[in-house]
């Protein structure tokens, strides 16, 4: 962390001496986050998001003996004034499933998710809940296709997830089961719980079998309409990384296209805000750090401009700095976070559509088996935690 940031941080603690120690308040049961033009809002005021990803919350909460890790994570997030966590509300097949077969659910895993939602509420953390993975981890679309094959469907591609009627039926049934679940702790149905900020249709969707984008567009149209028919309380986003279609492929890393389209997908009725992910070190490994940083700035700006055109808020839903990056240091991670946070703050301060960011990812202490290079253990990362707190405090002053 550079000296100017330290001085700003000290000044904030002097001016707002109670802000650091004051716990975040739990929110009431009546008020849902909504959008107001290009802004998130809550209780009549603009809401700016500073938060984190923790995909593992339900997985860890499955075992009552390890639920303290979930509690500690929310405690730490609240300490640094974070207000949103993005997590998986799925685990399809495998050794610790939420859904072990189509329509067959693991009550212990569901109770783990109940606990996550209940604890998030206690610490004033809203949740973004993703409903399926594009990737194989925790089952993903591959598992849905395999279930259909086991029932006699002649499928040859994981992308059949987006078109096969049986598979789409499996997905819809899962959406209904999750949204109508009544929390065993709070006694509130998920669809009626304002702790949840938003549902996410699918994490990082890609459809390489149809690069025109038509297949995925039709799927979003169908599933957004279906989900909203069950739950009109909550916001909905797709889970996009931000890739454009063929007509704007020059903005994508290496001009690749992935069968999704940031513009047309987000124009679907029922999609309430836009998202992007940012991994220039993975997507553009041949570039220098300076060139990657320049690309990242351009990536954010073009999506700010297009979200303004779409008249929807933008959330930077994943970004991070990997410890596996050549030459990595904590100071470089802090500097990267500062750059992203600065862009978010400047956009928000000027009335723009960028409503916040979620870094990837928070881990609790003693969770080294979950390390993926991007982990931030807040208790063990004082300088990064201060950068996060500074962002939380200055965004809160805009509300």
From Swiss-Prot:
The active site is at residues 204, 318. It catalyses: Random hydrolysis of (1->4)-beta-D-mannosidic linkages in mannans, galactomannans and glucomannans. GO terms for molecular function: mannan endo-1,4-beta-mannosidase activity. The keyword Ion transport does not apply. GO terms for cellular component: extracellular region. Its EC number is 3.2.1.78. Keywords: Disulfide bond, Glycosidase, Hydrolase, Secreted, Signal. It is an enzyme of class 3 (hydrolase). Possesses endo-beta-mannanase and mannan transglycosylase activities. May be involved in cell wall degradation during fruit ripening. Its main location: secreted. InterPro entries: Glycoside_hydrolase_SF, MAN-like. It comes from the Eukaryota. It comes from Solanum lycopersicum (Tomato). It is found in: Secreted. Belongs to the glycosyl hydrolase 5 (cellulase A) family. Residues 1-26 form the signal peptide. Disulfide bonds join 347-354. Substrate binds at residues 88, 203, 279, 360. Optimum pH is 5.0 for both endo-beta-mannanase and mannan transglycosylase activities. This is Mannan endo-1,4-beta-mannosidase 4. Expressed in flowers and fruit pericarp. The gene is MAN4.
